[in-house]
Amino acid sequence: MIYLVVLPFATAPLFRLAERLLDASISPSLQNAIYYYTLLAVTLIIFHSFLGHTTRNFADNLGNACKSILVGLIALYGLNELVYRLTRMLVNNHTNLNDTTISAQIHDAPRVTLLIVIFLAPFVEEVLFRGLVFGNLKSKSRTVAYVVSCLLFALLHVWQFAVVRQDITYFLLMVQYLVPGLVLAWAYDHTGTLWSSILLHAAANALHVSAGM
């Protein structure tokens, strides 16, 4: 919940405070880099044992993991096309501000943004949403694990924009992120290693970015 709700709004005041203390300006691209490198470091420290275990599972099931990543990519893009058409029917007057924000950041600072989008964000998000949320709920109910992890993942990508724009209908765009959340959870569940969902997430982001460039 800290990553989902608190950090998006807490980081801006913290960087303003840092600028005053340092008497220097911190560019948005540098802020993003600091933010995600900090998240990466915290994630590695907290989940190092789990990451070691899932890395061994990946090495032991490399063939199955690679096949699952390929199947996941095909499913992701096939289902996404259907969902995209559905959301265009439901919210034709809404632009996906998450995508436009990333596009603007790539234009302003391509190297830093691509590093974040393709490497840092997939790693952090998969550890939290699939490793932590899905992994903990799966032992209680696989269905609940899929539903909750998918909804939280979708909520992450739209709620800030809905709040800033004060438009509750913007939450309808969560539908666009349910398919990725479902496929990524399946990749982890099917292979037993989080690296399947991390690499699938990274590959999907890389293809999405390259298609928009």
Predicted feature residues:
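Residue-level signature of transmembrane alpha-helical entry/exit and packing/kink sites
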Residues: 1-4, 28-36, 64-69, 109-114, ...
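Alpha-helical transmembrane segments
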Residues: 1-13, 39, 70-76, 146-152
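Alpha-helical transmembrane segments in multi-pass membrane proteins
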Residues: 2-50, 97-108, 112
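Juxtamembrane "helix-exit" motif on the non-cytosolic side of transmembrane helices
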Residues: 13-23, 87, 158-164
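Membrane interface segments of multi-pass transport proteins and intramembrane proteases
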Residues: 18-29, 88-93, 137-147
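Juxtamembrane helix-loop-helix connectors linking adjacent transmembrane helices
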Residues: 23-27, 52-121
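Structural signal for the C-terminal ends of transmembrane alpha-helices
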Residues: 45-55, 187-190
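Transmembrane helix-loop-helix hairpins at the membrane interface
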Residues: 81, 110-213
